[in-house]
Amino acid sequence: IMQGGGPAIRGRTYRIFHKHSVDVVVNELVDWAKEGVAQLGCSPCSLVIGIGRTHYEATAMMIEAQVYGDFNVQSDLEKKITDKVNESHVGALGLGGKTSVLATFLKVGQQRASGVRIVSLSPNCCIEPRIASVEL
């Protein structure tokens, strides 16, 4: 990969003390995404995010978001994350530009009342596995 690493080493799974505000989680995710996208060696990417109670659950949610993600169907929160990362003008390959992220796929699992969420984020090249078929 051209500029120093692919999605496998740019992801992150960690806890966020959210103070019962979704904006705290979104801002932390955007900071992580900007850093990962700038170092990603591929064209504009898609962000895949899972939020859960444990590292295992957050990662499972992230994988499920990737499997069922649809570029044409984006929630308001997914659009908000995509727009905030694109406002950084990191661009493809970290070379600058208006489009760093094509879409965000987000899946949130059940939560508990504590002030901590485990978040798993992976900036994926836009050619990561998608559901497709070819008939010959």
Predicted regions and their residues:
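Non-transmembrane, aqueous-exposed alpha-helical and coiled segments at domain scale
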Residues: I1-L136
